[in-house]
């Protein structure tokens, strides 16, 4: 959420930033609503002050046995109480209107984010590794998985409908191995603390990270009003909600391996075959909570941690910076890491690492107190996939496929899968 004080002082900056994201200007509307609210707050405060003063004057009048004055003051206090009952309700309503309006405004892109409308305007930063030249036509993961007998979409559809997968045998073990490998890397070498969070959260948590109120259709909701997490970013970031974090403990770095649940609203017809776009999928998430001065450097560090996963697995990838029109709602800047999929002959996203500034910190009311200062500031938050486990499975299958349809296991994963070096067709 953006600061209304900042908007009052920088209306043109806001409107220019919204234009970069392809949105209409909103500063005039927001400032007018805030002025109306502030005017009402002033009237309420004046009435409260007069009520308190009149109440004291009643006591003085009674002590002086000036009953006429006392009665007039009592009548005035009564009128002020009636006025305040309605005025305070109006103040709450106006404050909520402003808060609701602010909650739907996206974050302000950093100055170095490239201008653009969609993913075609994203800018490639680097490529690591060279795609393998196969002596045969490489297959897509679902062709490989079904031929091996360990990937079953038909039975998954029978159980749950479209966009689900049943993995069996060594492919199920391989997906589990990938998640464990990533967690071990991030916790033992990258300084993250592993967390096992709830998979269902309240409205406040999903609001804090920015999925609510604007993107509710992308989420699954339980009958008792909780939300299935679309990413572990939600519970990990909200660990510090409504808290003042010790400055000496920053940065806080959390990681988790969780199932994630997404309705994939608006994705009809996209990636309908295979595991690329699922309602339920495994992902390792990284979250950092920092002070204002450290968040830019932390973004580079987090992205490097995600890249290291793919380097260890020997998977070719590229890193791109998203343009203003392709960034997520809460991001100031986002790096996408795209892994090479030879079956599709293209790069596909496997990680997205974003710095959000104090956008989520303000929504969560999560603060820290800088050393030597009495006042607090909102924390800065960052989140990144470290990485999407299902998509890593796809990448391993496609990049390590053999001509006979078997899958070679990357050396880094072999200790996690009982020393197995190859996945072959089920007997």
Curated annotation (Swiss-Prot):
GO terms for cellular component: cytoplasm. Homodimer. The tRNA molecule binds across the dimer. NCBIfam families: serS. Catalyzes the attachment of serine to tRNA(Ser). Is also able to aminoacylate tRNA(Sec) with serine, to form the misacylated tRNA L-seryl-tRNA(Sec), which will be further converted into selenocysteinyl-tRNA(Sec). Gene3D superfamilies: Bira Bifunctional Protein, Domain 2, Serine-tRNA synthetase, tRNA binding domain. Keywords: Aminoacyl-tRNA synthetase, ATP-binding, Cytoplasm, Ligase, Nucleotide-binding, Protein biosynthesis. This is Serine--tRNA ligase. It is found in: Cytoplasm.
